[in-house]
Amino acid sequence: MKISVKNTQYPSEKEQFAYLKDCGFDGCIFTFGHYFSRTGVFGDIYNVTDEQIEKHFTMLREEAEKVGFVVCQTHSQFSGHPKRYDSMDEIVKREEACIKATHYLGSKFCVVHPVFTANRRYDIEMKENFDAAVDFYKRLIPALEKYDVYCCIENMWHCDPVYGHICATILSRAKEMVEMCNVLGDRFKICVDVGHGLLTQDDPCEMVRIAGDKLGCLHAHDNDGILDLHAFPFTPHGKPCGMSWKPLRMDWTAFMKALDEVDYRGSLCFELGAPGPEPIWKAGYEYMAAIARYLTTLRNAEY
């Protein structure tokens, strides 16, 4: 089972793959905010050509291949909040560019957040938001088919406007994710984000089982059940002071066994960035890789 981590752009765009390989990783999740957001390298999206995208991301794939490194999945630039853009047309244009780049990077999976409606928290606006997300995702199908890429929908969270804590929203529940994939068709898979599941009190192990053969990729990270910390596995401990309820804690052994149950063949991807100040980055990445290697030994099957 390959282990991967979020790409870093360090020590440079071209050298990042060799750096992460030297830290112990086999591949990465390549994030596109640096490229296709409004302030990105290709931020002027209406004037970016297919040839520019092909040239740049083919170059990066070749740099990765030189050191035996792979892009296991990508993450599009869209946060899920349409008000940050002029129109849905602009959002779709940027997401199509991410799909093209995914193809040229040599990956099959691009994680794309759903559209959020303004009040989609708990069970509010469930149908309205589901339908809006379906309409958005359907517009990506031509690009997904043309470039042979699968869109992975991710379980999300929102904030309670009164109490300020994290709560469930669109696609927080695995059953809703499966339902959406069934509506959208074979070009859509599921990305189980472990940390997000903990925050919405959805057991990531059970989410994997419900996703079944629709599970396309993973975002593995830990937290205290309160904040989206994107912490190393095993790091958050104990119950925060003053809390009357016990946050959901991650059972990593059970999680790896759940991957066996559904015959998951993808990579174990840590959605984690560089830890701390630059002088300790390499040690931090090496520690992350050691954790990831340990977790892979908990599986019964070898992939």
Regions found by a protein language model. Give the residues of each.
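Active-site-proximal loop/turn and secondary-structure-junction residues that shape catalytic pockets
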Residues: 9-11, 32-34, 77-80, 116-118, ...
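Structural motif corresponding to the early beta-alpha repeats
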Residues: 26-135, 146, 252, 260, ...
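Conserved beta-strand positions in the central sheet of alpha/beta enzyme cores
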Residues: 29, 73, 111, 152, ...
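Active-site-proximal beta-alpha loop/turn segments in soluble metabolic enzymes
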Residues: 115-126, 153-168
